[in-house]
Amino acid sequence: MGCRKSSCPRHHTPKAGTFPPRWFPSAEEPGKKGGQPARPTVVISAGTSEHETITIARRRRTPQLKARHLLSAPANASDLSSSKLIFDVCRSPSDLLLRVPTTNSEHQQAELCATALRPTRSKRLMTENGTAQTGTVPVEQPRNGTMENAKLNMAEGDSSRMESGSKNTASPPVKADNNAAGTHSSPKKRRKVNHACVYCRRSHMTCDSERPCTRCIKRNIGHLCHDEPREPSKRARSEHEHSTAEEDGHSNNEFSNAQSMPRNVDVQDAAGQQILPDGTVALPPSSVSAVQHNTIPSSSAQNSLGHNSQQLLGYNEWLGGQSQFQDMHTFHPSYMFNAPEVTNEYNLLGDFLSSSLLDDGGMFSNDNLQGIYSDPTLINSMANLDNTALLQQAQPSQPTQSQPHQNDSVQGPSSTVVNDKARETYYMTAADPSGSDPPEERMNKLLKAKYDAGLLKPFNYVKGYARLNQYMEKNMKQSSRQKILRQLDKFRPKFRERMQSLTDIELILVEMWFERSLMEYDRVFASMAIPACCWRRTGEIFRGNKEMAELIGVPIESLRDGKLAIHEIIVEDQLVSYWEKFGAIAFDNTQKAMLTSCTLKNPNSSNPGNGIPCCFSFTIRRDNHNM
């Protein structure tokens, strides 16, 4: 039949609004047998006042209740089916009475019977889905719930408790345990590594231990992500610190260390030499003298062209530019032949930067310039050049009587000193490209920065012809040498005449296009398994693929930046035939390519009989000046 006493909260629920906000069961509560607590129950009653709140009371084995175990939270009787009720879990079972506020006139009552909670060592926040129905609905108390709305309900309880002005004391919120919440997981922070990659280190950003790192992959420069070479002492110390950090596992300290990363980072090249901020490098006296000797152009070559010597980069500036990009070559010497990187022009950046850094003043090749003359950014930048510097480069040299020549040394004007800030901007733009600009615009910005830094200058073809003549004197017969010189005398004056009619801006724009074309040929060479190479009209090879290097038996680095020439890999009689064919179609607009046969050789082989007979075709690229 059930208990008929009105004081039994299990079988009789008072009407809404007839009991105080805090209900304390008496000691004579039914269900007590032999001093044992009654079955834990949860009584939910709907109130009529807008300011009434839910009161959750915990009872120990004795009927005494303590105020610090009370917790209030707002709720709505109509939303009980979707709300979550918060309980303060303690060591012993409890009876919970909940007073539910309502904004309508309906009186809803519900009684939820729950099983006894098992004792736990620490207090935890438990949640339970309640169901608001008319009558009695038994619900089982879960042992593990979710923490999704725990903090929100507690905050709402505090605000509702202040509005109602009730005198109930709420217990302080208990910190949730991640282990108790099966479906909750805090966001995983990026852990700081001891040694960041070169680009994260320059940007002072947090890097990870993967190579390529996540940040470089998002910026589309994953193929360039690598660590800078370090000294053995620093490497050993960083490895020791890394192992210690893994054992300790202090993520907070690691985050603070990442925030306090020093702003100034010393860049070191592959040889371990420190590069100063101004781009200077400490060199022994022998290296200094060697560089000074190599940077002085030939006076006869300058007089033959009728031009003054171009501005020269000091050995400190040149070596600073070379060493900062040396790590790019040591990291991926043959990266251009990897299929995933064919479509990205910046995977060839290291080779592009190193090209023409050794070139001092003179003339250079010209090809089709469409797409460069239409760029207003480059034109405006070059139009703002110092007029004095341009006139000093274009006019022939006129020695004065008051200043006699001493040791025939060539000195550039003081106005042509390269700006350190412009050079630093170029290095950062080249090594760490960023932004969402199209590849064409990024390449224009890169070329503009290289020009502003004074590192983009015309190619000296006079040195190329002198190199060819020197090779023929040492390795070829007199008859073959005379035939080649006869062909050179036919087209070389025409090239010289047309080059002298061009302005300095036109010459630099042509050189920009040439370096852009080299990057295009890199993608073409990488996409086909056919030996191929690209050389200037004087014969210096500036690009080649690995198939070509394997064919003639040289490393791939030899087919870059003019280290090898076409006359060094072709046998003597076939070389004479090549120059005759080239002289015939050099200024003939009707002919562009020619298919012929030749015999290649290894430039390092002493036996000329070991030739490689093959059939090849060469294509001539011409510019707007028909060169």
Swiss-Prot record:
Low complexity biased stretches: 394-403
Location of this chain's protein in the cell: Nucleus
Pfam families (UniProt xref): PAS_13, Zn_clus
InterPro entries noted in UniProt: PAS_13 (IPR056751), Zinc_cluster_trans_reg (IPR053045), Zn2-C6_fun-type_DNA-bd_sf (IPR036864), Zn2Cys6_DnaBD (IPR001138)
Bias (Polar residues) ranges: 162-171, 286-305, 404-416
Induction, per UniProt: Expressed constitutively with similar lebels in swollen conidia, germlings and hyphae.
SMART domains found in the cross-reference section: GAL4
Cellular component terms per the entry's GO annotation: nucleus
CDD domains assigned to the protein according to its UniProt record, in alphabetical order: GAL4
Renumbered residue ranges of the record's region Disordered: 1-40, 129-148, 155-193, 225-258, 277-305, 394-416
Residue spans binding DNA: 197-225
Functional description taken from the UniProt entry: Transcription factor that governs genes involved in reductive and siderophore-mediated iron acquisition, and carbon metabolism. Suppresses the expression of sreA and induces hapX to stimulate expression of genes involved in both reductive iron assimilation and siderophore-mediated iron uptake which is essential for the maximal virulence. Also regulates genes involved in gluconeogenesis.
PANTHER family according to UniProt: REGULATOR OF DRUG SENSITIVITY 2
Protein name, per record: Zinc cluster transcription factor acuM
Gene source species: Aspergillus fumigatus (strain ATCC MYA-4609 / CBS 101355 / FGSC A1100 / Af293) (Neosartorya fumigata)
Gene: AcuM
